[in-house]
């Protein structure tokens, strides 16, 4: 049992054949003689019972199959922090039959030594360490007081994930000796709740990044400890079954990134409790099951006072199925980047490009969507396509090209809160843009079009047959080869006998001709 006495093992974290558990019981289990340890496994499938044996309850487990009885000699209680560091980072000299003479420099004078170099090497290796990874190294605590500070005083980043730390007090004993600590990963350590008094202010005076994924930490524990993280900027709380039960008061005010992914009990009302963290710039809400959001303090076309600094929002793997969700995100005053993959809204559509365009059009200040930058040309095309796609619905709801008569009803404005702004930006859609497309038949595939060059009087009007499925980009490519003009310089529009005096620009290179309702007999206008 690694020299650990049986009197102080309750609550200790242990490792058995690569699996981690917490000791819940130590004693006799009749009728079998000898000492047993009752453990609750992190993986409930590893156990056999709930802590009971032949009708007697020896300890309790959260899961009915998470418990086991194990002989003490099979249990690993781990090692202290410094031992783990030496095991991982100190290069031991190979054993030699005879010690060889070594030369070291003390001051400016070379000195001959025998066997002294290994001590210097160890001290040098440890004192230089800044970034330390001790993941799954069975670390159980700080060890002798002050030894960490003496051996490795320059550590700035530690990965202590999946170790045998069992309490916040053990973590504090380590951190107190590392005066430059900025990054700490405690994921997959099952830490017991701190004492009723909060962590001493200044326990982690330089800590900027704290990772507590899969630790079982509660929101109340986070707030209780947070006074000890006065300059914390990034906090990761993934997979903890967290319920946000109260608003942070005088804590977490410096946090810029908060990761609450895979906490399936969080809903929109709980999110409002963290909506006024003043410096929160990045919020990660992947896989929390959220399907709706509404900012009650902001009406149509207005910005919410909630999440005032939020720039990047991650909503992957949720249950978002309604466009109203995107409309609400437009109310966030600082939102510039959104990731929203693997949601019913984005996965249900056969046309991923159209879905992307509609998200861009609905969130006016967005600069990045799903990690892809939104260039000005893409935004313009997306907004024009969106304006056209819902133009007929806008007219039926009371929309009109004449500003004096343009009064769409409240239902339309609620469904499309940016539509009026887009009409002001680009002009209201003309009737010609809103023509109903003809059914896609074989005879409609080829269009006979005239091609004119309004600014090039020496160019003759020509006639071409083009598929109505041909994209604007491919039309430009064809004309570029024909005219010996770079694609980037070409501007396309068209006019139709059905719309005398009107000219429709073909702004989006990715759309086919039929999207713009180009028909037989229409005329392409090419400028450069």
Swiss-Prot record:
Q: Which GO terms describe its molecular function?
A: alpha-tubulin binding
Instruction: Give start and end residues of every LRR repeat.
Output: 152-176, 178-206, 207-229, 231-253, 254-274, 279-300, 309-330
- An example Pfam family from this entry, by short name, is Ubiquitin_2
Q: Which residues form the CAP-Gly domain?
A: 27-71
- GO-annotated cellular components: cytoplasm; cytoskeleton; cytosol
Mind listing the UniProt keywords for this protein, alphabetically? Acetylation, Chaperone, Cytoplasm, Cytoskeleton, Leucine-rich repeat, Phosphoprotein, Repeat
Q: Where is the LRRCT domain?
A: 343-385
InterPro entries, alphabetically? Answer: CAP-Gly_dom_sf, CAP-Gly_domain, Leu-rich_rpt, LRR_dom_sf, Ubiquitin-like_dom, Ubiquitin-like_domsf, Ubl_TBCE
Q: Give GO BP annotations, semicolon-separated.
A: microtubule cytoskeleton organization; mitotic spindle organization; post-chaperonin tubulin folding pathway; tubulin complex assembly
Q: Which residues carry this modification: Phosphoserine?
A: 496
Compartments reported by the entry: Cytoplasm; Cytoplasm, Cytoskeleton
List the signal peptide residues. Answer: none
The protein's predominant localisation is cytoplasm
Family matches, as PROSITE patterns: CAP_GLY_1, CAP_GLY_2, LRR
- Which residues in this protein are found as N6-acetyllysine? 464
- State its role: Tubulin-folding protein; involved in the second step of the tubulin folding pathway and in the regulation of tubulin heterodimer dissociation. Required for correct organization of microtubule cytoskeleton and mitotic splindle, and maintenance of the neuronal microtubule network.
Similarity comment text for this entry: Belongs to the TBCE family.
Relate the assembly described in the record: Supercomplex made of cofactors A to E. Cofactors A and D function by capturing and stabilizing tubulin in a quasi-native conformation. Cofactor E binds to the cofactor D-tubulin complex; interaction with cofactor C then causes the release of tubulin polypeptides that are committed to the native state. Cofactors B and E can form a heterodimer which binds to alpha-tubulin and enhances their ability to dissociate tubulin heterodimers. Interacts with TBCD.
Protein name per the record: Tubulin-specific chaperone E
- Identify the coding gene: TBCE
């Amino acid at each position: 049992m690694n020299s650990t006495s049986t009197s102080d093992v309750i609550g200790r974290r242990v490792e058995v054949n690569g699996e981690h558990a917490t000791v819940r019981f130590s004693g006799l289990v009749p009728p079998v003689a000898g000492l047993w340890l009752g453990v609750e496994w992190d993986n409930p499938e590893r156990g056999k019972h709930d802590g009971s044996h032949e009708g007697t309850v020896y300890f309790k487990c959260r899961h009915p199959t998470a418990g086991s009885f194990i002989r003490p000699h099979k249990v690993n209680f781990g090692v202290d922090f410094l031992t783990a560091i030496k095991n991982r980072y100190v290069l031991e000299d190979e054993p030699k039959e005879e010690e060889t003479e070594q030369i070291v420099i003390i001051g400016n004078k070379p000195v001959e030594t025998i066997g002294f170099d290994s001590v210097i090497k160890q001290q040098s290796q440890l004192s230089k360490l800044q970034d330390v990874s001790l993941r799954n190294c069975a670390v159980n605590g700080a060890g002798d007081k002050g030894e960490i500070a003496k051996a490795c005083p320059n550590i700035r980043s530690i990965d202590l994930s999946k170790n045998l730390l069992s309490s916040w007090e053990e973590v504090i004993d380590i951190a107190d000796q590392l005066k430059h600590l900025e990054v700490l990963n405690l994921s997959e350590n099952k830490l017991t709740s701190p004492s009723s008094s909060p962590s001493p202010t200044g326990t982690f005076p330089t800590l900027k990044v704290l990772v507590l994924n899969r630790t079982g930490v509660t929101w109340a524990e986070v707030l209780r400890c947070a006074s000890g993280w006065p300059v914390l900027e990034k906090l990761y709380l993934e997979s903890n079954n967290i319920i946000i039960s109260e608003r942070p008061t005088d804590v977490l005010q410096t946090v810029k990134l908060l990761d609450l992914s895979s906490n399936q009990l969080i809903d929109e009302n709980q999110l409002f409790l963290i909506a006024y963290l003043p410096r929160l710039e990045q919020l990660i809400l992947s896989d929390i099951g959220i399907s709706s959001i509404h900012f009650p303090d902001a009406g149509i076309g207005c910005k919410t006072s909630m999440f005032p600094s939020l720039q990047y929002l991650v909503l992957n793997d949720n249950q978002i199925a309604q466009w109203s969700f995107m409309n609400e995100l437009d109310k966030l005053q600082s939102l510039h980047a959104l990731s929203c993959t693997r949601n019913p809204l984005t996965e249900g559509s056969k046309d991923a490009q159209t879905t992307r365009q509609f998200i861009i059009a609905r969130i006016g200040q967005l600069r990045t969507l799903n990690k892809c930058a939104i260039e000005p040309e893409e935004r313009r095309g997306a907004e024009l396509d969106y304006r056209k796609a819902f133009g007929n619905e806008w007219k039926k709801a009371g929309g009109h090209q004449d500003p004096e008569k343009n009064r769409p009803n409240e239902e339309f404005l609620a469904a499309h809160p940016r539509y009026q702004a887009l009409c002001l930006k680009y002009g209201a859609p003309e009737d010609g843009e809103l023509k109903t497309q003809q059914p896609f038949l074989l005879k409609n595939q080829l269009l006979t079009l005239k091609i004119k060059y309004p600014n090039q009087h020496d160019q003759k009007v020509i006639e071409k047959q083009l598929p109505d499925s041909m994209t604007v980009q491919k039309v430009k490519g064809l004309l570029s080869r024909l005219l010996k003009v770079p694609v980037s310089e070409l501007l396309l529009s068209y006019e139709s006998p059905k719309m005398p005096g009107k000219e429709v620009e073909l702004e989006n290179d990715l759309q086919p001709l039929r999207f713009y309702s180009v028909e037989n007999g229409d005329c392409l206008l090419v400028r450069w």
